[in-house]
């Protein structure tokens, strides 16, 4: 009788020990834990996607400096390019603001040819030479600093002239000092002070070549280009009618 009781007690204890455990006590790596991990990963991935979509719809505001440099649409120029520059012309100027026409006006910053990393302050040109009382030019001319986008090079080809450049984290414009006739069309009276009974005369704008920074494909390079530099009088002797 006692043996039967012991057998029943042992069978009861074995049955309790073999009963399945709850999900709260499932060891790592079990199917229940894997389902929970997959669910957590899916929720995390969905949260990351939502965050990325929100960032794309509402991008972070850019700094004012970045917006200013981006809107300039300029080309970054290697400082070594200026060290290779030769035949510097006083009619070409790299400046952060429009330069003055007279030395008496406010000076501006520009890149110097000898040391482009050192910006000097000076004015380049005068608007017109000073004449003594009673002196007049045979042709009226006008001078101004201009920005060119295209020009003709020394080989007669049309080239693209760089207007804005990014040099040492500052935006500079390339200015050209041009002089041309005030009246683009010749006047019947001819040049001032020329005897119209003996000479045919007219005023015309002449050009010369200066070294300018241009675009060659996707690279910046120095080229000789033509710009207006003077207004001169052209004369020819009238033929006598017999």
Curated annotation (Swiss-Prot):
* Bias kind Basic and acidic residues: ranges: 47-66
Q: Which Gene3D superfamilies match?
A: Cystine-knot cytokines
Glycosylated residues are 166
| UniProt-listed SMART domains | NGF
Q: Which residues form the propeptide?
A: 19-125
Tell me the leader sequence span.
1-18
Q: Which InterPro entries match?
A: Cystine-knot_cytokine, Nerve_growth_factor-like, Nerve_growth_factor-rel, Nerve_growth_factor_bsu, Nerve_growth_factor_CS, Venom_nerve_growth_factor
Could you tell me which residues belong to the region Disordered? Answer: 47-70
PANTHER family named among the record's database cross-references: BETA-NERVE GROWTH FACTOR, NERVE GROWTH FACTOR NGF -RELATED
Put simply, this protein is called Venom nerve growth factor
Q: Specify the taxonomic lineage.
A: Eukaryota, Metazoa, Chordata, Craniata, Vertebrata
């Amino acid at each position: 009788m006692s043996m039967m009781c012991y057998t029943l007690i042992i069978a009861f204890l074995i049955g309790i020990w073999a009963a399945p455990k709850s999900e709260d006590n499932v060891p790592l790596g079990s199917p229940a834990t894997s389902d929970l991990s997959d669910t957590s990963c899916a929720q995390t991935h969905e949260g990351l996607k939502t965050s990325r979509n929100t960032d794309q719809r509402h991008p972070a505001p850019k700094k004012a400096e970045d917006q200013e440099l981006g809107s300039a649409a300029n080309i970054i120029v290697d400082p070594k390019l200026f060290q290779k520059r030769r035949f510097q012309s006083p009619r070409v100027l790299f400046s952060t603001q429009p330069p003055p026409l007279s030395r008496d006006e406010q000076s501006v910053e520009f890149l110097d040819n000898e040391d482009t990393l050192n910006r000097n302050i000076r004015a380049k040109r005068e608007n017109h030479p000073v004449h003594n009382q009673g002196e007049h030019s045979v042709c009226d001319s006008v001078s101004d600093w201009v920005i060119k986008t295209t020009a003709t090079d020394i080989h007669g080809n049309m080239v693209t002239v760089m207007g804005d450049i990014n040099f040492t984290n500052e935006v500079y414009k390339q200015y050209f000092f041009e002089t041309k006739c005030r009246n683009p069309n010749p006047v019947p009276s001819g040049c001032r002070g020329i005897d119209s009974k003996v000479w045919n005369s007219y005023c015309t704008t002449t050009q010369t070549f200066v070294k300018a920074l241009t675009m060659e494909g996707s690279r910046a390079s120095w080229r000789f280009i033509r710009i207006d530099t003077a207004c001169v009088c052209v004369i020819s002797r009238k033929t006598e009618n017999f």
